[in-house]
Curated annotation (Swiss-Prot):
Residues 4-189 form the Flavodoxin-like domain. This is NAD(P)H dehydrogenase (quinone). The keyword Repeat does not apply. It catalyses: a quinone + NADH + H(+) = a quinol + NAD(+); a quinone + NADPH + H(+) = a quinol + NADP(+).
Amino acid sequence: MSKVLVLYYSMYGHVETLAQAVAEGARGAGSEVVIKRVPETMPEDVARQAGAKLDQEAPVASLEELADYDAILFGTPTRFGNMAGQMRNFLDQTGSLWFNGQLIGKVGSVFTSTGTGGGNETTITSFWHTLAHHGMVIVGLSYAAPELADLSVVKGGSPYGAGTIAGGDGSRQPNEQELALARYQGRHVAEIAQRLHG
């Protein structure tokens, strides 16, 4: 049985919702799944004033534990076509894991949320640079997910990874097609991790 970590940052809860769907998909493939988040770097009063969702159930991950998993699915909001600063800050502290090759051969995948749909693909592909430097096996979503080709509804996601479009004011929540893509990505990554790591 493979061990899968779903590691995310979510300011308003959209990525948190996707993370839960990703985890559900990975569990459906028979993997042991843990959901964790990266630390918030914004002062609490500033986050509160911005309307951030501060009551997220997932515990905060430690850097060292990343090496304990066969696959890691990373979730982040899009910030100007890049990952959120909180995720970047966390990953910038993984130098010792890189130096010791502790993530080499582990499966890595990314899902995202964006306000208006802009930057989701560049967020994922720029995230892949970090995964490649760690020697991770990068896995996208693929067009095998039938919801990806469904043009009857507005949705986030691409062959690079699942996603949601939150709307400019953040009021739009992930729809069923977006959650289905997230579940598919979790299952897909877990199945590949099982093939690679037993």
